[in-house]
Amino acid sequence: LFSFESHFAHYSPGDFYKRHYDAFRGEANRVLSVVVYLNHAWQPTDGGELVLYLDDKDQEGVKVTPSFGTVVAFLSEEFPHEVLPAMRDRYSIAGWYRVNTSTADKVDPPR
């Protein structure tokens, strides 16, 4: 692994993120996705779960409640995922471990 990029994410009530991959096979340098949740006293009615799918055909997925201290890690190119609508403010730090995809001896820094 070459570097780590991250961002602080705030979802307001009603916000969601459609199903997607964090990297496309062979086209990006994100390798491992990591999410750390910062939400105290999260309740099932608060929504905002991360849903990880085994592949594009999986319609059920596995739901992860965004409770304080929960950490999720998954391969960026392998697992489609989404965030269901949040019913209250939802906070996390999302990040990606990257590999160096440099060419001609030039370093490929995080974007």
Can you say where each PLM-predicted feature lies in the sequence?
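Catalytic core of non-heme Fe(II) oxygenases with the double-stranded beta-helix
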Residues: 1-110
